[in-house]
A protein has these predicted regions:
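Bacterial N-terminal signal peptides that target proteins for export
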Residues: 1-8
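Sec/Tat signal peptide C-region and signal peptidase I cleavage site
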Residues: 17-23
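Bacterial N-terminal signal peptides
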Residues: 9-16
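Low-complexity, intrinsically disordered terminal/linker segments enriched in charged
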Residues: 162-213
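Short beta-strand edge/turn micro-motifs at domain boundaries
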Residues: 144-172
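Early exported N-terminus immediately downstream of N-terminal targeting peptides
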Residues: 24-105
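Surface-exposed, charged secondary-structure patches
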Residues: 103-145, 197-213
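Surface-exposed, polar/charged faces of alpha-helical domains
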Residues: 25, 40, 44-55, 84-88, ...
Length: 213
């Protein structure tokens, strides 16, 4: 989907964490510090800019994906249907959704150019374990774009489980797609649809690897 591609392209500008500090650092400070490193790498690395598949995916795998709570994200996107899925179905669904976002994050990273990120003051108490980190993406042309994250703290530190661009949450956007596929073919039908989409994306250059209608 074109809208989801925009979601991920913007979110990738700031979506990154670091394991060594994940449990100790404030969530907004953590995102700000590490996102700067990822953004600078994406801008300066010619191989990434050219869409070098292995290099881009390696960056996504090491800097972004370990600190996204994919199981929680998948469960929320699946809604009430998640409870009806078997453990094996839940595992397969989470794996395919994760792979879909791997391709999408990677495609977005290869297109990062002149964007910068500005973070807003964190509205949370020190003891809070579920917060919203607010930011905006500044572009050379056009108005700033609001970009917020829902971040929860668990045993292994802070992890993102939802993203908001222009007032719409990513999980809610996928929820409609998931429900439509489930209504047609059940949980297995959704897993197959995601698997087929991932196979299709794997055969394309990174700069086109994003879900489309």
């Amino acid at each position: 989907m074109k809208f989801i591609k925009q979601f991920i392209a913007l979110a990738t500008v700031a979506l990154a964490f670091n394991a060594a500090h994940a449990a100790d650092e404030a969530p907004d400070a953590l995102v700000k510090r590490i996102s700067s490193d990822v953004l600078n790498t994406a801008k300066s690395d010619k191989a990434i800019q050219a869409g070098d598949t292995k290099k881009v995916i390696d960056l996504v795998e090491t800097k972004i994906l370990p600190y996204v709570d994919f199981q929680r994200m998948t469960a929320l996107a699946s809604g009430r249907f998640w409870r009806d899925a078997t453990p094996d179905q839940q595992k397969a669904l989470t794996e395919q959704f994760r792979q879909l976002l791997v391709f999408t994050y990677s495609g977005a990273l290869s297109q990062v150019k002149d964007q910068t990120v500005e973070f807003k003051p964190l509205r949370a108490d020190p003891t809070d374990t579920d917060v919203e980190v607010r930011s905006q993406v500044n572009q050379a042309r056009g108005e700033p774009i609001p970009l917020n994250y829902r971040v929860a703290k668990g045993p292994n530190g802070w992890k993102i489980y939802d993203i908001n661009v222009l007032g719409a949450w990513l999980v809610e956007t996928y929820k409609g797609t998931f429900a439509s596929e489930i209504s047609k073919g059940g949980i297995d039908g959704l897993i197959k649809a995601l698997t087929d989409k991932n196979k299709s994306l794997a055969a394309k250059p990174l700069n086109t690897a994003a879900p489309k209608k």
